[in-house]
């Protein structure tokens, strides 16, 4: 898949180069498939009115630390420029009207596709999380509570669940900060075990955009920052989505 992404990127870059200089997107506001403004871009990803279920809302399984920190970040959305990202069951729902670049799109007759981190439907048993994004600073904070279905060592979360959650937070941040679409690499250094049903805070930042790649970093820690669970870095391929053809 990664090789295929590079092949498509190279082909798109070649055709674009015949018409204009290659365009790297170092800021959030250039013209793109989303339109000519940041507002247009976010209106696609963050619809004001939708009948889709937002899974990034509090439920009875959330621990007290998760609930209180969620409320703190909600307050920041009112005054500090933070945005609470909705979380639908499929990424298809986040990019309605758009599609993957030519050569990457696949057809499927599956009607109930789900993103991996929303595949466990029982509240509190799988991935409980919410992501807040700061567009000016190009960073995110993810509040993650691993449930008992994500257990690895008895009583502790499987390392793969944290890796999946880091990748998901990286991908949403990369997409909104610079049209990052695909994970090219993900490196994780685990530091401490995470108790099941406890809060993990993940601080994600975009470090740079270079050669059509977005370089990201993440620190996963406890709320009081006294325990670091893991540190990671990721690289994402920058590609623009395309408008879907009218049916």
From Swiss-Prot:
UniProt xrefs under Pfam families:
4HBT
A Gene Ontology biological process in which this protein takes part is:
cardiolipin acyl-chain remodeling
- E.C. no: 3.1.2.2
Reactions it catalyzes:
hexadecanoyl-CoA + H2O = hexadecanoate + CoA + H(+); (9Z,12Z)-octadecadienoyl-CoA + H2O = (9Z,12Z)-octadecadienoate + CoA + H(+); tetradecanoyl-CoA + H2O = tetradecanoate + CoA + H(+); (9Z)-octadecenoyl-CoA + H2O = (9Z)-octadecenoate + CoA + H(+)
Name the principal localization, coarsely classed.
mitochondrion
Q: Which InterPro entries match?
A: HotDog_dom_sf (IPR029069), Thioestr_dom (IPR006683)
Which residues does UniProt mark as catalytic? 167 (proton donor/acceptor)
Q: Report the SUPFAM superfamilies cross-referenced here.
A: Thioesterase/thiol ester dehydrase-isomerase (SSF54637)
- Please give the subunit comment from the record: Homodimer.
Q: What is this protein called?
A: Acyl-coenzyme A thioesterase THEM5
Q: What gene is it encoded by?
A: THEM5
């Amino acid at each position: 898949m990664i090789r295929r992404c590079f092949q498509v990127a190279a082909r798109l870059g070649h055709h674009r180069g015949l018409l204009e200089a290659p365009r790297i997107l170092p800021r959030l506001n250039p013209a793109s498939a989303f339109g000519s403004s940041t507002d247009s871009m976010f209106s696609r990803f963050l619809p004001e009115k939708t009948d889709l279920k937002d899974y990034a809302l509090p439920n009875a399984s959330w621990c007290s630390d998760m609930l209180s920190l969620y409320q703190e970040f909600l307050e920041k959305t009112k005054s500090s420029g933070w945005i609470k990202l909705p979380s639908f069951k499929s990424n298809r729902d986040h990019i309605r009207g758009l599609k993957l670049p030519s050569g990457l799109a696949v057809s499927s007759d599956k009607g109930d596709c789900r993103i991996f981190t929303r595949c466990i439907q029982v509240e509190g048993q799988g991935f409980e999380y919410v992501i807040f994004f700061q567009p000016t600073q190009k960073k995110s904070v993810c509040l993650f509570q691993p449930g008992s279905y994500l257990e690895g060592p008895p009583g502790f979360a499987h390392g793969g669940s944290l890796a999946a959650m880091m990748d998901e937070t990286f991908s949403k941040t990369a997409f909104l900060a610079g049209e990052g679409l695909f994970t090219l690499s993900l490196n994780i250094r685990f530091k401490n075990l995470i108790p099941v049903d406890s809060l993990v805070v993940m601080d994600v930042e975009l470090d740079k955009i270079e050669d059509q790649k977005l370089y990201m970093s993440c620190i996963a820690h406890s709320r009081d920052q006294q325990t670091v669970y893991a540190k990671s870095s990721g690289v994402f391929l920058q590609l623009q989505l395309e408008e879907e053809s009218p049916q």
